[in-house]
A protein has these predicted regions:
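Non-catalytic, solvent-exposed segments at the cell envelope interface
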Residues: 2-240
Length: 240
């Protein structure tokens, strides 16, 4: 039961912090799962927010790190076919397929020189049912079905253009959740439960979700794709 609750609230991070925080529904699932102390282990202290979360497609076609600091958010795509910054001559995709999510998290953290506190492992081949439960989604003036959006995650992001498009989908779905009604959002939550795993506690996810609200609104959000031509410097590859 605790695991299912944790999976439910993973939507707080990737897609829809507003619903998980703003609705009573989120509070109903808090009892007996996680604690404030666990949340502070992720964020450092009650008042200072600084954490990194890995978002991985189970097919290995998209890896992103969401880095939250007080007042700003970075969404960084890591090209799956690229190799770690130092020490290994094998791709992140191969590391994930052969050694799993924990080793991938470790190598990405080393390459970015950032702390990565947890992960969300999402089967994006199931995104269709989630989006359709929301009644479709509009992105850049066009309405997409869930099946159309799945296409963005059916091959590895080998360049900045593909990685940027994948980020666009994640952010757009988040905004769509924020505008969804309570019952429609609840239905989509149940769909999302079936395609997500996480190692984060509910209390930590709720804190992260609250911090992500400005980013979903387009405030203080920096986007990047790494590495580009071997360059791991985030500041020189900012997309926005």
């Amino acid at each position: 039961m605790a695991k299912r609750i944790g999976v439910f609230v993973t939507i707080v991070l990737m897609i829809v912090p507003v619903l998980a925080i703003g609705l009573t529904l989120g509070g109903l699932f808090l009892a007996g799962t996680g604690s404030s102390e666990e949340a502070y282990e992720v964020f450092g202290s009650q008042n200072a927010l600084s954490t990194g979360i890995l978002l991985a497609d189970t097919g290995g076609n998209a890896f992103m790190v969401c880095v939250l600091e007080e007042g700003s958010t970075q969404l960084i795509s890591i090209l799956p076919t690229s190799t770690p910054k130092e020490g290994l001559n094998t791709s992140f995709l191969s590391i994930y397929q052969k050694e799993g999510i924990d080793r991938l998290k470790q190598e990405i953290a080393k390459s970015l020189s950032l702390k990565v506190d947890g992960y969300l492992e999402v089967d994006f081949s199931g995104l269709s049912s989630v989006v359709d439960a929301l009644g479709g989604m509009t992105m850049e003036g066009k309405t997409y079905t869930g099946q159309e959006l799945e296409g963005y995650f059916q091959r590895p992001s080998t360049d900045q253009t593909t990685a940027t498009a994948q980020q666009d989908v994640v952010l757009a779905v988040g905004r769509r959740f924020c505008s969804a009604g309570f019952w429609k959002g609840q239905k989509a939550f149940r769909k999302f439960m079936k395609i997500t795993e996480t190692d984060l506690s509910v209390s930590a996810l709720m804190k992260i979700g609250k911090a992500l609200i400005p980013a979903l609104e387009g405030k203080n959000l920096q986007r990047a794709c790494l590495p580009l031509e071997g360059n791991w410097n985030i500041s020189t590859t900012a997309l926005s």
